[in-house]
Amino acid sequence: MGAVFLSGRSGSGKTTFILNEIREKLRDEPLGKPIIFLVPDQMTFLMEYELSKTPDLGGTIRAQVYSFSRLAWRVLQHTGGMNRPFLTGTGIQMLLRRLIEEHKGEFKVYQNASDKSGFTEQVERMLTEFKRHCLPPQSIRDMMEGTGKSEYEDERILSDKLHDLYILYSKLEENLENQYVQSEDYLTLLAEQIPYAEEIRNAAVYVDGFHQFTPQEMSVLEQLMVHAEEITFSLTADKPFTANSPNDLHLFRMTGKAYYDLYQKAKELGLDPSEVRLEETKRHRHHPELQHLERYFDERPAKPYPGQTESLRIMQASNRRTEIEGIAREIHSLIRQGRFRLRDIAVIARNVEDYKDTIKEVFKDCELPFFIDGKESMQNHPLIELIRSTLDIIKGNWRYEAVFRCVKTELLFPEGQPKERLREQIDQLENYCIAYGIKGDRWTSKDPFVYRRYASLDEDFAKTDKEIETENMLNELKGWIVPPIHRLQKRLKKAETVREMAEAVYLYLEEADVPMKLEQERRLAEEGGRIAESRQHEQVWDAVIQLLDEFVEMMGTERISFALFQQMIETGLESLKFALIPPALDQVFIGNMDLSRMYGTKCTFLIGVNDGILPARPADDGVLSDEDREWLKRNGAQLAATGREQLLDENFLIYMTLSSPSEKLYVSYPIADSEGKTLLPSTVVKRLNELFPDSEEKMLIHEPEQLDDEAQLEFLVNKGIALSHLAGQLGIWTRQYAISDVWWSTYNFLMNEPDRIFSQNILSSLFFRNKVENLNRHVSRDLYGEHIQGSVSRMETFKACPFSHFASHGLKLKERQFFKLEAPDIGQLFHSALKLISDRLHELKLDWRDLTKAQCETLSSDAVERLAPKLQKEILLSSNRHHYVKQKLQKIIARVSGILSEHAKASGFAPVGIELGFGGKGPLPPMRFTLKNGCTMELVGRIDRVDKAESSKGLLLRIVDYKSSDKGLDLAEVYYGLALQMLTYLDLSITHSTDWLGMKASPAGVLYFHVHDPMIQASVPLGLDEIEKEIFKKFKMKGLLLGDQEAVKLMDTTLEQGRSNIISAGLKKDGSLRSDSDVVAEEDFHVLRRHIRRTFQQAGEEITDGKVSIEPYKLKDRTPCTYCSYRSFCQFDESLEENEYRILKPEKDSVILERLKKEDEADGDF
């Protein structure tokens, strides 16, 4: 038995030396004694490939490539030790989750942290570390007791941490003892079984690719030294460390220490170790710059390289995306030149997670095949989401978020139906559930979903055919979504043990045909050449079944709550990862600096070389802090590297990466992060500049215009990328700047290729202006017809912004409805409740002035109770919170009813019409217009309230409109067409008064009544009567009144002098109207009536002529865009030349009236 220690710097040919020696043995004796090639997990596939591609070998059965775990499986299969069930890390984490829940009450430090996400994984990592470093629970207890008596607080806190870890560690071992085995146990078992392994006893063992070893691995290597026929260790070091371990600042500290420990162990075992030192760095012999870098990287002071650097390039970029885009272009350039294959290229980062998403996106766009080394979480796979969301449905009482997370995995979709149609229907169902607040037993009830697109508080309409069709579709979806989940819910409720719970989940997946659906997806991915995706579908099902099996194996007969069951399943699912191997041989390798192993790499891109990232700052996010680890190490406990040791080893990892390529090295760094914050270059960049003072840094540019023509050609990676950059260049050209002829050639090529339609559509966006052309006559007629029936508010919308009108009434776009009570719903309730109360008073032959406070409360309560089931999908009946809101609304309506009663007592006006309809079946006809373009238009709607009074001058009519906000009448808004309702209602009432009331009426005014429950503020305490008076004042009606003393007194019979508490008017001592009264002459009302008719005529003609321009108004600081639903759709942007507000000048009422009179005179009779 002999031990050979092979050493050499990076690139000296150690791995090639071993491979050649193995090849020679295979050539000499193809079926000779076993050859074991022991390498890290990340290197097994690569070494197997290197051996298998040797052209003159008849086979490699004799030689096997192993990692430690694969060797353990092989040996234990032959010698025994595999009779206990194996628990994966997933199973361990699930078991730990249960132990944490059971014992967290005993914790001294981690009681609060135990409920946080990731805690179980951190504990599992810590306990794994204990095992790998051969520290049993008793050792942890001894350290705990040793620190617990310390006079220092930090050490006592460490003792408390060890106390909590000891509880979990000891309980875990109790659960595993003599029943299960975990991955870390296999190395211990391997070390025990090697003496009995026949294939080891005669084997030649080669160990390569490792930088250091855990105590567990050292125990295995010790047994291999004893029992293997020969063993060769290969370690990257500048010399054999036979007598002393290197000092802490030595570049090869990590590997040198491993060399020394192994060498000393070989001597202890009585072996005669020999050393082979490879002096020459063969990897870089044709590239002196790389040879210089490898040789002098760690020498101080730096030895400058005399000359240009063809094989080394330093690059900087504005951000990470630009960095990766530049690297992708460089890779394409290298491939086009024929110098490299994709498999010759590696992209290495200190932490590839920082770049993973960007690399995936950019390399996919650039059509660069790649493989990211490392395990990827299964969290985003549909099967994992199906299980998690289904359990969330059961836990959360069928909340819609969880339901649609589940449904959108598409694993519950029934077979044989087109997925596109189902997706569209699911979107409709989701909209329905959001709008109707569907949750809980509304899913599981046998009662079908009820769908109403149109609803009214005042009338019951029959369902339309479209509503019935939609309702049937919704219930059909419910019919296949609910049963499997509901069956699972029932089974879990009945389940008494973990086995029964796990079986319920398995049955759920089987009944939903999940295995068959995954197999179909796997086959489709395979047929489409998506090999990695195909393997994922295969692995995820196996992983879930193994998870359930382990769960049952560990706790099958135990009883646990559903909450703990879900927590443990969640913990298990979070730990599942895909074990991927490269799906193809020719692809770019993407890896982590510390974990990835490379061989035969010709070109390396080291990315993200920024300060704080490289060298990496040690992470201090475990359950033990770096100070804890330092203390334990000083007191004899051997654990993984401390933060200080990790920092010392960073230089070695950087050295290994920089020296990994044989021909070309690129080092790049961004100067800003994704948020624009400055990033500094790493000290590695400074070091490279010291070693290569003549090297020039290249700036990776996102846009090509700053480069010469030849460099711009690099941006033509493929058609898609070329088109993207061409669009940018043509955008520059449209701003009157010259662009390279490269882009005109690209333009000509794309415009003349067979598939040019796509390119034409993309490039047409360059000439886009956010300006809408008016519809032509035919389109307008098709959209609106030749007869328009609309409302006053529709005309106000058009006058506010024609495009908003087009979106809402032309395209009929609607926002997604939500199950919540909003201001329009409350306003609708107020209107309908007051109408019901008025109707009830009419039935009882009572007047408003006859009402008592008790009657107001009773009538209000009855009205709200009748309306609640009809309002917004029964929202007021949906929860205790909304029940409280309903009571508040009843209180407001009772308060308002009382005020209306008081108003009636002090008024000579009485209601003559409530919710008075005009047009349709209403008592008043619509307002009709014949438009100049031959179309017709009629306006229909309802008037909240019309009051009448007899005066010495005849019949007077006034309009009262109920508003849930405090509002007055601004004549500027009337003039610009933004507030037309009140005067329209007055015009209709006056115009048709003879037919309606039997006599001609005159206008008395228009008033807004604010429906609310006012809050009274006072500087001194007030009595109840004073409070009621103040409340009464808060209901003063604002608007515009007839400037006639008799009319004003009819509206407030209590008014003698001063301001009225009922209307916005007042009288002086001499009986004349106060100057601050909101009044106009009767003729002014007629001028206003004629103006609104002209406004409607103009709006109708513009609508039917196809006006759809984006022209929102701006009046003072008010614009319709503030609350517009279509803002993101119209994309109005004031910074664009073609987008500007239509500025409306605010004017005093007197100025507006004068202007209207002049316009009236100019137009003549309307």
Curated annotation (Swiss-Prot):
One of its GO terms (biological process) is double-strand break repair via homologous recombination. One of its GO terms (molecular function) is 5'-3' exonuclease activity. It is an enzyme of class 3 (hydrolase). It comes from the Bacteria. [4Fe-4S] cluster binds at residues 801, 1121, 1124, 1130. Despite having conserved helicase domains, this subunit does not have helicase activity. PANTHER family: RECBCD ENZYME SUBUNIT RECC (PTHR30591:SF1). This is ATP-dependent helicase/deoxyribonuclease subunit B.
